[in-house]
């Protein structure tokens, strides 16, 4: 089991980073995921890959909920807006990886998860639907919405042609 889990580590690390947007949080999430994978038995009706991504996602959701409560008291919106304004001034020109990461962070969690599994991890719709426990049609609609929102966030002045 350890060998199979270790083969999934690079993909799980990318997925964890796409969820958290921070390498340190991603590594913490990855560590917690691996710990759970190695201590809990694989469900009989699941593949290791789908189960591993599901465990990672569920741990992230748990932490996301807890962090949301903690962050609401700690964040100073005025300072954060000031920092973002200075960063925007410093970055002129094309779209940066940081902008894409920030935009992905603003997507609803279910769209961010779907986009990450399909576009970053290269999963098929059926594999992603197994990981997220939703029908393939839901994966397709979430992916379309995520791509549309991401495009609008990164290119706000782009005209929509009907």
Regions found by a protein language model. Give the residues of each.
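A short, charge-rich alpha-helical start-of-domain segment used by transcription regulators
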Residues: 1-14, 18, 24-27, 43, ...
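Short, small-hydrophobic-rich alpha-helical interface motif
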Residues: 12, 16, 26-37, 55, ...
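C-terminal flanking helix
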Residues: 13, 34, 108, 112, ...
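Sigma70-family region 2
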Residues: 31-48, 67
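Arg/Lys-rich amphipathic alpha helix in sigma70-family domain 2
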Residues: 43, 55-75, 93
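Helix-turn-helix DNA-binding module
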Residues: 105, 109-113, 121-138, 149-152
């Amino acid at each position: 089991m350890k060998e199979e889990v270790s083969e999934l580590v690079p993909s799980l690390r990318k997925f964890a980073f796409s969820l958290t947007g921070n390498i340190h949080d991603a590594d913490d999430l990855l560590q917690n995921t691996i710990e759970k994978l190695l201590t809990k038995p694989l469900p009989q009706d699941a593949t290791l890959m789908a189960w591993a991504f599901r465990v990672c996602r569920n741990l992230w959701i748990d932490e996301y909920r807890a962090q949301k409560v903690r962050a609401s008291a700690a964040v100073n919106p005025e300072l954060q807006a000031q920092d973002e304004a200075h960063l925007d001034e410093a970055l002129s020109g094309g779209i940066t990886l940081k902008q894409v990461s920030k935009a992905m962070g603003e997507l609803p969690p279910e769209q961010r998860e779907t986009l990450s599994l399909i576009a970053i991890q290269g999963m098929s719709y059926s594999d992603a639907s197994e990981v997220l426990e939703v029908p393939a049609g839901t994966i397709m609609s979430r992916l379309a919405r995520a791509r549309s929102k991401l495009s609008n966030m990164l290119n706000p002045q782009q005209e929509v042609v009907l």
